[in-house]
């Protein structure tokens, strides 16, 4: 029995690969990404003494990317809304004011800790999340996590079940483009995901008092684009999975990095550079930027152009890949359908002369 199970495991290469790859993946993630301490933050210094004050900041922690003596506090708030920097220090007043982006929870905690050691020379003001509530940061990210679950796991399982029941074979004989079939298949899941998004957003506001400071249209547009990406990913997973179990395994393998490396749990700024770049390849990373930006900071579409552009590119790539794979799945059934149709037509054509000959023979006998 033991030998038989080992043989079965050796034949199931996908499960074997998961057993080997998953521990390695978890080791890398928790070794290089499981870090809540942000060691460097982007800072801007504005106001009349901007240049002089910037020189006094500890360079090991503050990466001063902007020094503008002519800017004021209004400009500082706009820079934080655009997430150009994590903190803007406004000089020309006593004490000096530091506006901190509270939507970046762990970075803002580190900034406040460092500035509190200045001996009262700097007064801190936390914007967008004044009490540094974890729920305010997590709820916008959880919306994306739920959409990811629906798009990858639920969609892939639903489509694989159709293959197991033979429904896809019926689609193969229909004159429908693969892209049209995919759009028809993902439409119900798109609707379910949209309803869940509305429910979670509403409950987040009612239960946790999470603000919604931005434009609703920008938020809905970002959610729709992200949902399109993860639904395409779910279709792609279904095309490389033969059974429901394989679909669940593959979808979970795709979901785990998105949970841990998207910045939802561990801050991207605290990750090792190599692991951080993996995070930048994940769709949930960019939806989290959009949802937190719109809900907490009131960010505009113009300031969120990068995550929107990346999600658009991902949607094109993922949907194209899913269409190509889906076309390959339908191709054998369509070839079989055309192959059986041609002999039937030839038999009908052959039956015509035979029937005519039989009729003429009957006429001569009469």
What are these regions (language model features)?
Residues 138-156:
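Long, hydrophobic alpha-helical segments
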